Amino acid sequence: MSVFKGEVTSLPPDKSISHRAALIASLSDGETEIMNFSAGFDNQSTLGVLQACGIPVRQEEVPGPWGTAILRVVIKSKGLWSLTPPSAPLQCNNSGSTMRMFSGILAGQPFQSELVGDASLLKRPMRRIADPLIQMGAGVSLSPIGTAPVVITGSKDLHAIDYRLPVASAQVKSLVAFAGLHAEGETRIYEPLSSRNHTELMLGLEPRVENEERVIVVPGRRQREARPFQIPADPSAACFIVSLGLLARGSEIMIRDVCLNPTRAAFLDILIRAGAAVTIENRRTVGGESIGDILVEGTRDMEPLVISDPQEVAIAIDELPMLGVLSAFATERFELMNAGELRTKESDRIEALALNLERLGFVCHQEPGGLSVTGRKGRPSGPVVVECFDDHRIAMSFAVASKACGEDIELSDREVAGVSFPNFFSLLDALEV
């Protein structure tokens, strides 16, 4: 069995913050410098749609603080209504974040546009983005089954609304906020459960509590001055490296400068609660975001993961596939509930986990909103093909198990990891001793 040791300073920049930094830059007056922007396919899709709408974007590699190259992005804009009509459908590729959040900006522009994507994205539900935008005065049309292509007929006459999110969704919250920036009046967004709060932090919106509900108030039609952004390392990417270290006994890995925003780091709380040897060091605040270093040691057994709290599920949603695979291989047990949202991601992640774990000998039981693993009948005698379903997180989760546990796994699609973690496989190889 392999052992992994080393210091990780080349984790991908945070995907969520990179998306938002670029989108906010397109709405700000002046030149925005974004340091350590993500080079992943999804974030490049966001830059691509901005350029297609006439926003100048410049990218270059520059030396980073740890001696490795980082991506510097400069975006120029004149403010809220700087976009121009695109000459062709806006290609979001595999990025649901691009499609959903950019829709909020397009709703406030005085032209019609169409958002399209790859085969996987064209299957994902988009009806939840249409309702608030239509209420604000934009036109939105979807396919007959509520998926992309998304056609937005924007308007400079949007009006503010009070909107209660039907589910915890940072993307829908963000698109309503971006549309609200273009609207007359104050848009109020009510959250039943907290979701990642980068948009509020980056826009300087202070949440309120009214009648025990979290409310975000978005003042409309205020010009924003450009300001620089520094992107920390992506905690969702860190989860794969943390899991690698926990699965491989004797490993010791230090991961530097990771975003530890409380709405993103729930996976660490889950692991520490289960007895995993994970320590947070050098915690500090940079650009309004909590960041720090994560030390992971493969030194002791952990308890099976039981994840059921709706709030915890909501803020650990992207890490759940890796946590499920980790718990299955470490303890042959896993329990997940209240996670129906996983079925609407790049793939039906509950189905993808169950199918592939069963191929590897685990006993699984699916529910509409959950998954349980209750044991393992034995390791397969030969190689097992893991079906990735065009989903980067499914691919990387099982790649970690293969590398750390010596499982004979072949991925149906290795390249899909590049959606969020371009150097994933090279980093695993570099850490192996």
Swiss-Prot record:
UniProt KW keywords: Amino-acid biosynthesis, Aromatic amino acid biosynthesis, Cytoplasm, Transferase
Entry's Gene Ontology cellular component terms: cytoplasm
Binding site for phosphoenolpyruvate: K15, G96, R124, Q171, R349, R393
GO MF annotation list: 3-phosphoshikimate 1-carboxyvinyltransferase activity
Domain of life: Bacteria
Pathway: Metabolic intermediate biosynthesis; chorismate biosynthesis; chorismate from D-erythrose 4-phosphate and phosphoenolpyruvate: step 6/7
Record: active site: D318
Disulphide linkage map: none
GO BP term, example: amino acid biosynthetic process
Enzyme Commission number(s) of this protein: 2.5.1.19
Signal peptide boundaries: none
Reaction it catalyzes: 3-phosphoshikimate + phosphoenolpyruvate = 5-O-(1-carboxyvinyl)-3-phosphoshikimate + phosphate
Function: Catalyzes the transfer of the enolpyruvyl moiety of phosphoenolpyruvate (PEP) to the 5-hydroxyl of shikimate-3-phosphate (S3P) to produce enolpyruvyl shikimate-3-phosphate and inorganic phosphate.
Entry similarity comment: Belongs to the EPSP synthase family.
Name of protein: 3-phosphoshikimate 1-carboxyvinyltransferase
Organism: Chlorobium luteolum (strain DSM 273 / BCRC 81028 / 2530) (Pelodictyon luteolum)
Lineage summary: Bacteria, Pseudomonadati, Chlorobiota, Chlorobiia, Chlorobiales
